[in-house]
């Protein structure tokens, strides 16, 4: 029995999940702090891959990142890297498709966080980084874990965009 497809799927899902773990937390944290109007516009843009069929997302990525398109040609010329039909393009497409799951779940956890805990830390003279990693993240760990599991499961089953 050939196990290569399973290992390939696991590898792509794992790498995409690691990328999305940090990108999703970063985006959710900063967008949760924005004014309501800007937050709404960014929400629509960032969750678009969730509502579009995977084949449409894959087609759009091909149209944007193809070697004869502006972005694809620039990356090919500047770095010598082809952005389509490679192993890394599968990781990129999977990352684009799973991003909304991580982002929305973590943003919900950040918005449910009691800000008085962060304010208390500030009055005690704690740095923002310390407050984020030692107060906010432990309080939001269930949302972060849920988003990570959802993203990994979606990445493992992704076929259409890649």
PLM features: residue spans?
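Short, highly charged low-complexity linear segments
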Residues: 82-83, 119-123, 161-162
């Amino acid at each position: 029995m050939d196990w290569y497809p399973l290992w390939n799927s696991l590898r792509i899902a794992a790498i995409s999940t690691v990328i999305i773990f940090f990108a999703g937390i970063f985006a959710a944290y900063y967008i949760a702090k924005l004014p309501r109007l800007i937050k709404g516009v960014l929400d629509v843009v960032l969750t678009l891959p969730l509502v579009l069929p995977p084949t449409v997302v894959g087609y759009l990525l091909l149209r944007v990142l193809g070697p004869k398109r502006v972005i694809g040609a620039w990356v090919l010329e500047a770095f010598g890297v082809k952005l389509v039909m490679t192993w890394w393009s599968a990781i990129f497409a999977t990352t684009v498709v799973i991003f909304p799951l991580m982002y929305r779940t973590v943003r919900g956890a950040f918005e449910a966080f009691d800000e008085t805990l962060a304010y208390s830390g500030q009055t005690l003279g704690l740095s923002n980084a310390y407050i984020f990693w030692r107060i906010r993240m432990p309080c939001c760990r269930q949302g972060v874990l849920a988003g990570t599991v959802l993203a990994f499961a979606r990445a493992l089953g992704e076929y259409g965009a890649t």
